[in-house]
């Protein structure tokens, strides 16, 4: 939860923490620091207008980093203008909720995003997805194809290791694990 209004941040945190493992930050820079310290979120809920690094900059940074480009992002903001909404979606937001909002709406949006991702995993190629439902970049798709090709080629080798797969895709073991788990919901181990 990335929100500069401490009262609202605590409210969202308290309402989501019974269902999810939640971290909070007062701006985009703090959020990136939490991620840099090793905690990989399943979703980011961010305000638009914040000091130091606003929501658009945060989205852009997350989308341009291969290790975080798969993370769904929901933007919450007091801005109600269509152009702001369109801009957020173009930057890569998966959802947009105008303030004031009900916690029920936010939870429903989060659940919807997670459910759509599960559907993609269960039925690839059979799910109709609108751009605001899920963001999987070309690089993410290439990674999945590369992993699948490698697995098909090495499935019979009893000595194969996760480290070999990570080396093949050009990532560290932990980064690859987090990326594959975030994209597919499945562990590469």
Where are these regions (language model features)?
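Acidic, metal-coordinating helix/loop segments flanking the phosphotransfer/catalytic sites
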Residues: 24-43
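A Lys-centered signature of the CheY-like receiver
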Residues: 97-99
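Receiver (REC) domain active-site loop signature in two-component systems and cognate sites
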Residues: 50
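C-terminal output helix
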Residues: 101-110
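Charged docking surfaces used in two-component/phosphorelay signaling
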Residues: 10-14
């Amino acid at each position: 939860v990335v929100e500069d209004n401490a009262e609202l941040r605590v409210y969202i945190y308290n309402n989501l923490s019974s269902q999810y493992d939640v971290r909070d930050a007062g701006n985009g820079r703090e959020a990136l620091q939490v991620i840099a310290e090793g905690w990989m979120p399943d979703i980011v809920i961010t305000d638009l207008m914040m000091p130091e690094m606003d929501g658009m900059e945060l989205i852009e940074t997350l989308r341009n980093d291969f290790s975080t480009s798969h993370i769904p992002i929901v933007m919450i903001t007091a801005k109600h203008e269509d152009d702001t909404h369109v801009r957020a979606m173009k930057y890569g937001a998966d959802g947009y909720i105008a303030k004031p909002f009900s916690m029920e709406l936010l939870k429903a949006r989060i659940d919807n995003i997670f459910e759509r991702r599960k559907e993609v995993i269960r039925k690839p190629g059979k799910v109709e997805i609108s751009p605001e439902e899920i963001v999987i970049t070309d690089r993410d798709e290439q990674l999945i194809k590369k992993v699948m090709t490698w697995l098909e080629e090495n499935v019979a080798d009893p000595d194969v290791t996760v480290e070999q797969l990570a080396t093949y895709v050009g990532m560290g073991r932990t980064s690859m694990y987090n990326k594959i788990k975030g994209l597919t919901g499945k562990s590469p181990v």
